């Protein structure tokens, strides 16, 4: 069975859509962020990043994807930065190695929302670590959104869709019958 990989910005709705997809398809969800917390012995991601930095977190994501490359029949709910690594200067760059693994693992679905909508959704959310002390989330999004688009096999704008409708569209695209009808 094919794996479904959900990518998109922080706040796009990947976790909600993945749960709805799972409910409709009976395919289990694996969250890269949940696995990361598990792998660090329960340390929340903001704390891990604070203690170890983003570069270490991006390495952790890569090791998680390596472990999942032979997975079969999962919905992979990816953290917003899954497609990125940091260069020597600490700038975000496309992670070819992670993208290659994601493409090996399954079909990539980009869950898209507008920048304004995303900025509003994550404002003041303390469960999410700061992406940068200097750069605004808006400018990070401006760089990331085209990368998500390029990486995806399928793009779905969630602005006017419920999580259930989004899940149905993804299942239709993949050719899996919804079990909840």
From Swiss-Prot:
Keywords, in A-Z order: Amino-acid biosynthesis, Aromatic amino acid biosynthesis, ATP-binding, Cytoplasm, Kinase, Magnesium, Metal-binding, Nucleotide-binding, Transferase
Binding site for Mg(2+): 15
GO annotation, cellular component aspect: cytosol
Catalytic activity: shikimate + ATP = 3-phosphoshikimate + ADP + H(+)
EC number: 2.7.1.71
Residues passing through the membrane, by range: none
Alphabetized InterPro entries for the sequence: P-loop_NTPase, Shikimate/glucono_kinase, Shikimate_kinase/TSH1
Places the protein is found: Cytoplasm
Main EC class the enzyme belongs to: transferase
Record pathway: Metabolic intermediate biosynthesis; chorismate biosynthesis; chorismate from D-erythrose 4-phosphate and phosphoenolpyruvate: step 5/7
Cofactor note as given: Binds 1 Mg(2+) ion per subunit.
GO biological process: amino acid biosynthetic process; aromatic amino acid family biosynthetic process; chorismate biosynthetic process
Binding residues annotated for ATP, in chain numbering: 11-16, 128
Stored Pfam families: SKI
Major site of localization recorded for this protein: cytoplasm
Entry cofactors: Mg(2+)
Binding site for substrate: 33, 58, 80, 144
Recorded superkingdom: Bacteria
Listed CDD domains: SK
Gene Ontology terms for molecular function: ATP binding; magnesium ion binding; shikimate kinase activity
Biological role stated in the UniProt entry: Catalyzes the specific phosphorylation of the 3-hydroxyl group of shikimic acid using ATP as a cosubstrate.
PANTHER family on file: SHIKIMATE KINASE (PTHR21087), SHIKIMATE KINASE 1, CHLOROPLASTIC (PTHR21087:SF16)
Entry similarity comment: Belongs to the shikimate kinase family.
Assembly description: Monomer.
Name used for this protein in its record: Shikimate kinase
Protein's gene: aroK
């Amino acid at each position: 069975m094919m794996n479904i990989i959900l990518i998109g910005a922080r706040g796009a709705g990947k976790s909600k859509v993945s749960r709805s997809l799972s409910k409709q398809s009976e395919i289990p969800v694996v969250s890269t962020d949940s696995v990361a917390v598990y792998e660090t012995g329960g340390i929340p991601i903001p704390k891990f990043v604070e203690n170890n930095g983003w570069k270490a977190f991006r390495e952790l994501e890569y090791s998680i994807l390596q472990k999942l490359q032979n997975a079969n029949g999962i919905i992979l709910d990816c953290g917003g930065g899954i497609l990125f690594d940091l260069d020597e200067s600490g700038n975000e760059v496309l992670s070819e190695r992670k993208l290659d693994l994601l493409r090996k693992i399954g079909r990539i679905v980009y869950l898209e929302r507008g920048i304004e909508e995303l900025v509003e959704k994550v404002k003041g959310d303390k469960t999410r670590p700061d992406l940068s002390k200097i750069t605004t989330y808006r400018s990070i999004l401006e760089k990331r959104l085209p990368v998500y688009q390029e990486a995806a096999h399928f793009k779905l704008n969630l602005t006017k869709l419920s999580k259930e409708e989004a899940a149905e569209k993804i299942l239709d695209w993949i050719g899996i019958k919804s079990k909840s009808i």
